[in-house]
Amino acid sequence: MTKLIFMGTPDFSATVLKGLLTDDRYEILAVVTQPDRAVGRKKVIQETPVKQAAKEAGLSIYQPEKLSGSPEMEDLMKLGADGIVTAAFGQFLPSKLLDSMDFAVNVHASLLPRHRGGAPIHYALIQGDEEAGVTIMEMVKEMDAGDMISRRSIPITDEDNVGTLFEKLALVGRDLLLDTLPAYIAGDIKPEPQDTSQVTFSPNIKSEEEKLNWNKTNRQLFNQIRGMNPWPVAHTFLKGDRFKIYEALPVEGQGNPGEILSIGKKELIVATAEGALSLKQVQPAGKPKMDIASFLNGVGRTLTVGERFGD
């Protein structure tokens, strides 16, 4: 039986962990995840999905603020683990820890070498990629730069957003890891170096990147909106107030970028640099998320054709 330390944080990681727990070829000696955080307006302390899954399985849990140089790292090195599996952990692993293991692999939610970094699923959508996927790779000190052990792709559809793609790729990552680990541990797979000429980076989304620029095409804005749904959520401004857009569809239309072209009972069409967007799910300032019909029947009922979204 191979003894593992698992490291991860979000739902994606929890799905991978649960997959490992179903396979009796592996024993999880410990789980490492990010500390509990205060979330939302009420600052409610929330455990990570990986911590919740580990508690349900009765596993030992470590939550260092920073793994490098921590007492937790020293404890982990004394457990006698054969290897480490990480999936969206959110911290760099110290070389000292990596060197103490027979192997260390990462489940990364992109088709490397494209989309190294912390937001690969977001950027696959924002940049209009036709496919997404998961890469199992060896861990090295440089971020997401290790040799690739295996890859698996899935198509991106127009119905996908960050939420749906996260769910799909979590299952892909779980299955690919279970399919890959036995042969890799046995030495039957020769990892492949990444082509450095094809590397792109997908760092965590910055707040300024959430703002919509109506001087882009309808397709570009469609990809930005779904590439931030359900988090961190794209926004614009309406009458000086922040206005979040969760869902929109590219449609035909022509006008000044940001201009309202038409208003119906269940339709709000806004011009872009090329074509237009039909807004479907929005959140006005100080209000909950709502469909466009509810918005137009409520706080949006005073809108008129010709008004503008934007600064």
From Swiss-Prot:
Entry keyword Protein biosynthesis: yes
Recorded GO MF terms: methionyl-tRNA formyltransferase activity
Binding-site positions, (6S)-5,6,7,8-tetrahydrofolate: 110-113
GO biological process: conversion of methionyl-tRNA to N-formyl-methionyl-tRNA
Highest rank taxon of the organism: Bacteria
E.C. numbers: 2.1.2.9
Gene3D superfamilies the UniProt entry points to: Formyl transferase, C-terminal domain, Formyl transferase, N-terminal domain
Keywords: Protein biosynthesis, Transferase
CDD domains tied to this protein: FMT_core_Met-tRNA-FMT_N, Met_tRNA_FMT_C
UniProt catalytic activity: L-methionyl-tRNA(fMet) + (6R)-10-formyltetrahydrofolate = N-formyl-L-methionyl-tRNA(fMet) + (6S)-5,6,7,8-tetrahydrofolate + H(+)
InterPro entries given in the database record: Fmt, Formyl_trans_C, Formyl_trans_C_sf, Formyl_transf_N, Formyl_transf_N_sf, Formyl_transferase-like_C_sf, GART_AS, Met-tRNA-FMT_C
Any one of the GO CC terms: cytosol
Record family assignment: Belongs to the Fmt family.
Protein role: Attaches a formyl group to the free amino group of methionyl-tRNA(fMet). The formyl group appears to play a dual role in the initiator identity of N-formylmethionyl-tRNA by promoting its recognition by IF2 and preventing the misappropriation of this tRNA by the elongation apparatus.
Name of protein: Methionyl-tRNA formyltransferase
Organism encoding this protein: Streptococcus pneumoniae (strain ATCC BAA-255 / R6)
Lineage of the organism: Bacteria, Bacillati, Bacillota, Bacilli, Lactobacillales
